[in-house]
Amino acid sequence: LLFFIPFIYFVFKKILNISLIIKLIGISLLILLQGFIGWFMVRSGLTENLSVSHYRLSLHLLIAFIIFSSLIWLSFNHYFKTNKKFFSIKSSYVFLKVLISLIFLQLIIGAFVSGLDAGKIYQTWPLMDGAFFPSDNFLNNFFNFNDPSFVQFAHRNIAYIIFFLSVYLGFFIYKNKI
């Protein structure tokens, strides 16, 4: 209701242009989808095992992030001019897409960490119980997103990659005076 009532009001008052109306209709459809996904997620926990599926949890979080990001993107495009110098450099645009994709992946794996309670198994940092690779049967379960050990390992290391790429992006922007 917080979205739909003002949206309908602005449409009837002809405050929004057609391009923005179409984009906001797309976002409203995502909001409806989010409700269905929320029920789909909760339903997975209404069994003998009272925990929700980490896959469904991550899907619910991802759709929420897409909705939020879309609204932020629309508002920034409305209030600020695009940095044409940054986006005219093809490599910087590709780099930014990679960084944003990694952030989305990190969100998904973070939901896996939450859904699997993977954060409870290795509570030491920066190493995992004194080793870079977890000591349990980790290598046999590589890319097994049902294995809490692998999920925590992936979540930690993607965070390192995002950090270093973000620092590099900051230096790139500073160096090129963007």
How would you describe each model-predicted region?
Residues L1-I178:
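Polytopic transmembrane helical bundles with strong interfacial aromatic enrichment
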